């Protein structure tokens, strides 16, 4: 009986080991697909969501995403259930246009058919990245979700801001500006700490749309409306930058020098000095 008991224990151990060894091992790294069409077929065949990372070689935060977020075990584990794709947006420009990529990194969370659920615009650390993807896959915190919430709370400044940012990330700049302006109208004097940020977001969005004159005009309004604030300081520094982007380097240089004379101790001073040096080298 004793021998029989030991034999049964041994058989049980063998059975358990056999069952566990038959499980698919967890991935130890993310294997990125680089052929979008092949990845789309794989996602369709396996009925798995797609995580599509649009990057460029010069994008600093793209590299942080690679070296911090994508090597974290929590995020690596996602690749067992999701198809990860990497797209160099400056090489596959057609795909970048298809998804209306507005900046880098942009990570599009899509269904097995490639249709977007929502996107992560910019860098997120591992846990935040994981949680945001899971929410999108559940239909939560998406553009459609927030538009639905806004119907019940049309003056919710947080919802308006999130919706505007989501439109901007999709290159829908006019829609983004419309929602940012709603925030400014509801908080014109920045009493709720939303109005000034919304105005700053407007000039950033105008610049992304290459409306540099509009961006400069918005910056000037911030300087006039909120003098002595960090928002005004940032906006004044950006006037020179957008002037340079519009093609008038000499005027931009004058604006930068005027800024440094007025704000020598500003947190933006070093950044402005770098812009001055760059312009002086090229004029």
Question: Which residues fall in each region the model found?
Answer:
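C-terminal motif of bacterial Sec signal peptides marking the signal peptidase cleavage site
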Residues: 15-18
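Thiol-based oxidoreductase modules, predominantly thioredoxin-like and allied folds used
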Residues: 30-34, 54-56, 68-94, 104, ...
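Non-catalytic, surface beta->alpha helical segment in thiol-disulfide oxidoreductase systems
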Residues: 70, 102-141
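Short solvent-exposed coil/turn linkers within tandem alpha-helical repeat scaffolds
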Residues: 73, 122-123, 153-154, 170-173, ...
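Alpha-helical adaptor scaffolds
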Residues: 169, 185-242
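Short active-site neighborhood of thiol/selenol oxidoreductases, capturing the structured segment around
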Residues: 46-59
């Amino acid at each position: 009986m004793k021998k029989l008991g030991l034999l049964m224990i041994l058989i049980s151990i063998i059975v358990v080991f056999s069952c566990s060894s038959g499980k698919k091992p967890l991935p130890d790294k993310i294997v990125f697909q680089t052929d979008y069409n092949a990845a789309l077929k794989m996602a369709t065949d396996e009925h798995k969501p797609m995580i599509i990372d649009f990057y460029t070689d010069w994008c600093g935060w793209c590299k942080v995403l690679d070296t911090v977020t994508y090597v974290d075990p929590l995020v690596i584990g996602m690749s067992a259930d999701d198809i990860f794709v990497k797209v160099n947006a400056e090489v596959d420009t057609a795909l970048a246009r298809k998804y209306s990529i507005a900046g880098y990194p942009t990570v599009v969370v899509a269904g097995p058919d490639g249709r977007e659920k929502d996107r992560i615009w910019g860098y997120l650390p591992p846990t935040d990245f994981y949680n945001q993807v899971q929410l999108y896959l559940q239909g939560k915190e998406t553009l459609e979700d927030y538009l639905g919430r806004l119907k019940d709370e049309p003056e919710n400044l947080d919802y308006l801001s999130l919706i505007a940012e989501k439109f901007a990330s999709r290159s829908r700049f006019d829609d983004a500006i419309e929602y940012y302006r709603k925030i400014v109208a509801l908080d014109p004097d920045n009493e709720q700490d939303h109005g000034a940020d919304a105005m700053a977001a407007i000039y950033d969005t105008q610049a992304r749309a290459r409306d540099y004159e509009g961006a400069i005009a918005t910056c000037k309004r911030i300087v006039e409306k909120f003098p002595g604030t960090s928002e005004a300081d940032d906006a004044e520094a950006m006037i020179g930058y957008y002037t340079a982007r519009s093609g008038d380097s000499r005027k931009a240089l004058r604006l930068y020098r005027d800024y440094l004379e007025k704000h020598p101790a500003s947190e933006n001073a070093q950044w402005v000095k770098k812009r001055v040096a760059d312009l002086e080298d090229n004029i």
